[in-house]
């Protein structure tokens, strides 16, 4: 197997099944750690990561619970519980579909938009604090790369691959 590797390639191992020198494994683990780092500032403003994700999604336009569940990769009961909590806090409002009275959509309230802006600011500041521990040019590159990864996620979702 080692004979078929190109110069600089590493053979897959149980610790690194990709044989890429560990970059993909390191990236996967960094993504898991990043989720924790996002939770820190969100908890300080009384939002959970799933709530933040819902508010961010609704900022792109209203949505029915089934659409939200699919886009956020959670079960319908989970999205119902999330929405009930956000409704109780007046961060979202529920509207009946004028064409189908059985269908409802959810939209951000003014308070929801304010909460999302606070969350965006808090998470952004946390990313800057973490990024300050690398060279300034690298920090800017990390932030830009993370934003690009968000674009890739949206494209994969639109293609039905995520």
Annotate each PLM feature.
Residues 21-28, 32, 73, 113, ...:
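Short amphipathic alpha-helical segments with heptad-repeat character
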Residues 28, 59-62, 109, 143-150:
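Generic structural concept
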Residues 56, 81, 144:
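DNA-binding alpha-helical recognition surfaces that contact promoter or target DNA
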Residues 36-78, 160-162:
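N-terminal helix-turn-helix DNA-binding core of bacterial DNA-binding proteins
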Residues 1-46, 137, 153, 162:
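N-terminal leader segment of winged-helix/HTH proteins
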Residues 138-162:
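Exposed, interaction-prone assembly regions rather than primary DNA-binding/catalytic cores
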Residues 37, 113-114, 118-121, 152-156:
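Helical hydrophobic small-molecule/effector-binding pocket
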Residues 84-147:
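Charged, amphipathic alpha-helical coiled-coil/dimerization segments
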């Amino acid at each position: 197997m080692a004979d078929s590797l190109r110069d600089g390639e590493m053979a897959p191992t149980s610790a690194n099944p990709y044989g890429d020198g560990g970059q993909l494994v390191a990236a996967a683990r960094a993504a898991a750690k990043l989720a924790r780092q996002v939770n820190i500032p969100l908890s300080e403003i009384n939002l959970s990561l799933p709530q933040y994700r819902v508010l961010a999604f609704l900022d792109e336009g209203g949505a029915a619970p089934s659409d939200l569940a699919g886009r956020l990769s959670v079960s319908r009961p989970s999205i119902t519980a999330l929405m009930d909590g956000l409704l109780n806090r007046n961060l979202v409002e529920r509207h009946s579909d004028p064409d189908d009275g059985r269908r409802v959509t959810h939209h951000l309230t003014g308070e929801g938009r304010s909460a999302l802006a606070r969350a965006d600011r808090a998470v952004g500041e946390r990313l800057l604090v973490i990024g300050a521990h690398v060279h300034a040019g690298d920090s800017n590159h990390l932030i830009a790369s993370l934003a690009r990864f968000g674009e890739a996620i949206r494209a994969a979702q639109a293609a039905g691959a995520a």
